[in-house]
């Protein structure tokens, strides 16, 4: 990791500039501009089909935009050669919606997989790091010998988080981290996301439809609309009440919604938006 003493927390780790993505003739993202300062957690919310997951994958170099550029630590992800990109992706951690664990491996080998792919370490070191990460996400040591199919959905999510953090990444991306979980387990995952941020200076992107998660873990929230241009500062709500680029009526509704004063479902906000446009 880079030395935090030499870098300002206000320096963007990720800087997306006018990125657009098309699939065939369909516009998925249109001129998206956003920055993610070091150490902050950004939540991306929006209705189904608005491009949340596409935006997330573009920010980490998994989808190449048709226009625009994504800067990571002041370097253009899409101008890196394959070796440079591979080294940069080591600095990312991914927590997938379905945990994406390898069924052919036990939990120990699932969590150890990134170490064996990217580092040279002896088995004693690997074991110590894996067991420490499992403990940090609240899993007992006996889980290490189990297969993913033997675990509950919440336990698999925690294994996915342990694996994502095993290399101490600078950027962690969470794709719908609480989908399919009951409220109690959702709160556990949210607390683990916060605990990760407290343990070391990590920057995070959380794609979610869960307003409780957005309120709990994020410093900043982006409301993404289908095929709408997003300028710096626009559709971004700071929970301290800072102004946004939304018009006043819509701004109030979005703020209320994110704070939980207008309900917990995105379709409620969608109905509000439709009434504003009618």
Predicted feature locations:
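Short coil-to-helix segment of the ABC ATPase nucleotide-binding domain corresponding to the Q-loop/switch region
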Residues: 105-113
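Conserved ABC transporter NBD signature motif
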Residues: 68-76
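Catalytic Walker B motif of ABC-type/P-loop ATPase nucleotide-binding domains
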Residues: 172-175
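Conserved ABC ATPase signature
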Residues: 147-151, 155
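Helix-to-loop junction immediately C-terminal to a conserved catalytic motif
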Residues: 60
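Conserved catalytic motifs of ABC-family nucleotide-binding domains
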Residues: 168
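Conserved ABC ATPase "signature" region
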Residues: 75-76, 123-142
């Amino acid at each position: 990791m880079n030395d935090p003493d030499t870098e300002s927390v206000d320096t963007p780790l990720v800087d997306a500039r006018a990125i657009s993505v098309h699939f065939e003739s369909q516009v998925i993202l249109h001129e998206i501009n956003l920055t993610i300062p070091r150490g902050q957690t950004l939540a991306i919310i929006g209705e189904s089909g608005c491009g949340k997951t596409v935006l997330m994958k573009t920010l980490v170099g998994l989808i190449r935009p048709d226009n625009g550029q994504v800067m990571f630590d002041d370097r253009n992800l899409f101008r890196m050669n394959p070796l440079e990109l591979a080294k940069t992706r080591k600095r990312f951690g991914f927590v997938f919606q379905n945990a994406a664990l390898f069924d052919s491996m036990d939990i120990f080998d699932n969590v150890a997989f990134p170490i064996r792919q990217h580092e040279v370490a002896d088995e004693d070191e690997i074991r110590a790091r894996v067991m420490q990460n499992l403990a940090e996400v609240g899993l007992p040591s006996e889980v290490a010998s189990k297969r993913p199919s033997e675990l509950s959905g919440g336990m698999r999510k925690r294994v996915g988080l342990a694996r994502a953090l095993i290399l101490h990444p600078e950027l962690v991306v969470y794709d719908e981290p609480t989908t399919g979980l009951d409220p109690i387990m959702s709160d556990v995952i949210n607390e683990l996301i916060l605990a990760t941020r407290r343990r070391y200076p990590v920057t995070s992107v959380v794609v979610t439809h869960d307003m409780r998660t957005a309120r709990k873990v994020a410093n900043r929230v982006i409301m993404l609309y289908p095929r709408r241009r997003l300028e710096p500062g626009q559709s971004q709500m700071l929970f301290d009440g800072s102004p946004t680029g939304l018009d006043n009526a819509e701004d109030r509704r979005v703020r209320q919604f994110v704070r939980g004063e207008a309900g917990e479902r995105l379709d409620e906000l969608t109905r509000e938006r439709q009434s504003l446009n009618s």
